[in-house]
Amino acid sequence: MTLKLIWDKFYVSIIFVITCLVLGIILMCTVIGSGSEYSEVDVNEGDSIWALADQYAAKSDMAKADFVSWVEKENNLTDGHVKAGDYVVIPVHETKLQRSDSTIQLANQ
């Protein structure tokens, strides 16, 4: 069979397969890119998971107890203790954290 004969016979199938491959690649890139949206915060001296919950739970739309449970599970904290200098992943999307940390200054001030 020549290429022209194959194309004439199966062009709909070939276009369908190519479209599926392109859409699959786009979907995979989207899913892979969205996996790292959670924020990572530096633990300061005297901080605890509950202190982080006080500070960030409202931004994550979670109750404080749920926030603490999520942080312990995702960061493999069996005893629930963190020490200064540790980095902890919290269930707050980076965009929410950046938006709330920035300040807006009025032009006349």
UniProtKB/Swiss-Prot annotation:
Keyword presence, Transport: no
Gene3D superfamilies hit by this protein: LysM domain
Gene Ontology CC, one term: cytoplasm
Any GO BP: SOS response
Cell location: Cytoplasm
PROSITE patterns registered for this protein in UniProt: LYSM
Main localization, broad class: cytoplasm
Span of domain LysM: 39-90
Family annotation (InterPro entries): Cell_div_suppressor_YneA, LysM_dom, LysM_dom_sf
Keywords: Cell cycle, Cell division, Cytoplasm, DNA damage, DNA repair, Septation, SOS response
Keyword match DNA repair: yes
Family: Belongs to the YneA family.
Functional note: Inhibits cell division during the SOS response. Affects a later stage of the cell division protein assembly, after the assembly of the Z ring, by probably suppressing recruitment of FtsL and/or DivIC to the division machinery.
This protein's name: Cell division suppressor protein YneA
Name of encoding gene: yneA
